[in-house]
Amino acid sequence: MKILTVSDEVVERLYSLCQSGHFREIELILGCGDLPYPYLENLLTFLNVPLFYVPGNHDPTHNSDNPLAHVEGGSNLDLKVLRFKTFLIGGFGGCIRYRPDGTNQYSQSEAYLRAFRLLPRLLLNKINYGRALDILITHSPPFGIHDEDTHAHQGLKAINWLLHVAKPRYHFHGHTHFQRRNLSPSETTQGLTKIANVFPYKIIEVNH
């Protein structure tokens, strides 16, 4: 299955690529946060495939009754797990708290408490499907992987815990902006998991 993953920066060129049929094989869009919701809605309209997303630290608090606080037609996957085709996909939004009143920002302890809320569904998946998760999407990177020295871009240790417990085959995130000048790779393999920073977008083919 081919997935369009996006995060953190609007790439208007994607609109013309969508219209030209360049993405005709895309079956799913995954948003990893900090993108204007109209941008995600436009991609959804052009490709006419499901869209799952998690909020970033620059996104509003989710409110399904407020058209400005959710993606119309998309599914907010924060702290949720669902099955799409044959893939089990989970989401974890937000990043490390770097402002006292920051939206979708959490201390390391708060992030752990949020992550624990996914545990019952992960265990149920393990019983029903023999595996907890195939794909994990987050805004923040894990602690020590694709993160940065600045506090605002420090990874969340709770995501490391989720990777250890759920052992997904794929983990996609944003938040840290890998530019061409960066020497660090944007893809890493840890254990059974391929970890990819999808900024600003990547087309990824996933398999079981």
PLM regions with names:
Residues 81-85, 160-166, 178-208:
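Binuclear metal-dependent phosphoesterase catalytic core
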